[in-house]
Amino acid sequence: MLRASSKRLQLSWQVFRRFQSSNPQLSFPCVDQAQERSRQFEQSLQKQQACPNSVDPSASITSPSLSSGPEPVYGKIVSGFKKFYHNKPFLCDHGGILPKFEIAYETWGTLNKDHSNAILLHTGLSASSHAHSHPENTAPGWWEQFIGPGKDVDTNKFFVICTNVLGSCYGSTGPSSVDPGDGKHYATRFPIITVNDMIRAQLLLLDHLKIEKLYASVGSSLGGMQSLTLGALAPHRVGRIASISGGARSHPYSIALRFTQRQILMNDPYWNRGFYYDGVPPHTGMKLAREVATISYRSGPEWEQRFGNRRADPSVSPAFCPDFLIETYLDHAGEKFCLQYDPNSLLYISKAMDMHDMSASHQRSLSENRKKNQHKLDKYLSADVSAEEIIKLNEDTSVLPDVPYQEIANEDRAPEPDPETNLIAGLAPLKDTPVMVMGVESDNLMPVECQRETARCLEKAGNKQVVYHELDANESFYGHDTFLIYRKDLDLVGGKLKKFLELS
């Protein structure tokens, strides 16, 4: 009897399996959303091809914005800036040549008669020149609360200049710009650039503005790297330097994070080796890369207080798409950014950050590289050089390593300069310049040891005017983004910067 019943159950189960799964397939609305965006792009591109004078296909495709918590004010800036045009060939550190370039910039305050009150404000990776609102662009800037009459960067006293860095996409020449050689987007034909190259371009802007010496150079994150670099390349052109959440060289953890973001982006099939400008952009890779970046921009303690391990809606079944509050936050951060910034600019500028190293040996290597490549510029300036020769001059020689990853034991390595001694020598040009270095203990992207090392090496290089500030976890748990966050009840960055700038 029991045996017969068992056989009937087995037969019923076999019949069930033939016609129906034991469980329904999960739904993936986040995947559907990405596919729908691609479909919208493809439809818009088809319409644009049929009607060439139609609007940019990305204009009608929107992403949600973040509304909860203190968040940076970043946006896609397409107007309201001035332009500096450099119409001569520009040799980059790694041998590439730009036939000409443009730098977008904005200014606040009034330049005094002897042009001695100018502050150059350097941006982070994805920021535009729009640090503060003005009549030509009334939208709030990314440092809106820090700049203005009587504020931390006081425009009653100072003439503030903010540029969009070389390689970016908000008015300055970058991969999305048109190559004058063939009238097409540079894409990944744009040359590899360094932080030093960014500074050389900015110095040419200062020449154009007839500013021989800045009152101060101020920057955070990538901007902090630029600020220090300006002081090292042209110490005679700056009176004081503020570097916030930056450093004199990139940390391996930071390099690893940015490398991961680039790999995610480059493996989006729509990236197409950088040639996506006439097609669908790599929006999914860009979104995921931004989510990884956002993890590095903030801190665990803040998120524990803000999100904990709470689900967005406990009444629904768990899902692989955004489910926990922290997941929905990351998803929104990625959505907000994925169509605002050029993916190739992210590749180029993040790589420049990775290569940032102010040690004496590295700077010497770059200098030797420039001398070695000077013949390219000379040939470029020659009237009889052909287009084919120019392409050959800039030919890429990068290859994968012959040997896979290997951990090299310290005793087997070729002799190298002591890192700290090397960095001290590299920072020697700054020994007579007052420098403020600020770090944040909760910073995951640029660990506070980077700022401690920078201040320590400046002092050992003979600089007796180093001011060091470190915000501990009780003062700020906002991580790397601390420099972007303004709170009336907390003196995070602004008050310390104001005191340094106005110190006689």
UniProtKB/Swiss-Prot annotation:
Residues 117-395 form the AB hydrolase-1 domain. GO terms for molecular function: L-serine O-succinyltransferase activity; serine O-acetyltransferase activity. Residues 49-70 are annotated as: Disordered. Its EC number is 2.3.1.-. Residues 57-70 have a biased composition (Low complexity). It is found in: Mitochondrion. GO terms for biological process: cysteine biosynthetic process; cysteine biosynthetic process from serine. Its main location: mitochondrion. It catalyses: succinyl-CoA + L-serine = O-succinyl-L-serine + CoA. The active site is at residues 221, 443, 480. Keywords: Acyltransferase, Amino-acid biosynthesis, Cysteine biosynthesis, Mitochondrion, Transferase, Transit peptide. Residues 1-26 form a transit peptide. PANTHER family: HOMOSERINE O-ACETYLTRANSFERASE, SERINE O-SUCCINYLTRANSFERASE. Transfers a succinyl group from succinyl-CoA to L-serine, forming succinyl-L-serine. Also has weak serine acetyl transferase activity and homoserine succinyl transferase activity. This is Serine O-succinyltransferase. The lineage of its organism: Eukaryota, Fungi, Dikarya, Ascomycota, Taphrinomycotina. The gene is cys2.
